[in-house]
């Protein structure tokens, strides 16, 4: 609703597809995108789907939306992200509760806008699935196990709450993010100095600083938006883009890269 309120050139009746990225839907069924269509008062002759991805979700959403537009299935795609990881965190999980924040975003992807969507570099490695997981609640292990215990540091361990192997996630990140950035540059026929701004998934400040130094990116070209919201999963990149746009920093080539749970990663260049 805020998107339509602040953008007079975007009308509800122009939306012909809804993409909704979330890993914390209200229901197993129906599809949340169908509920959103009704709640927003959108037309009924439109497409609407959910997809479940975490920190790479926004960039994947851009890829899906671009495909829908190029394939002439849609002209104006409403791309939504919404994540409430707080539902998955035990109240005494001090480590993860200080990292994650709940947030949502709304973007219109169309043939007109402030930036052209370039080529994508995508990646998947399911071997890392167990390193960031909520085991119960879905069809494989539907019932809660109530197997709560505490490790030597007093952190809760339970199949019913989010588990993150921080060391393995860091290893995955420092190995794969430079690769996806390099692949994204290659796909778009660009060199690193030609990128005006790098907007990566806002995992945490330490990890982002490590990656920036590893990839030898100047600090003034590397965007941070964490202090007020934390790691907002699929919403972190669009929130950062929104803030960067307010600061008039979305000029020239802007490289986006999302990475995390799955493992899943994705990169693209926006040409503003």
Please place each PLM-identified region on the residue numbering.
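Short beta-strand segments
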Residues: 21, 52, 77-83, 109, ...
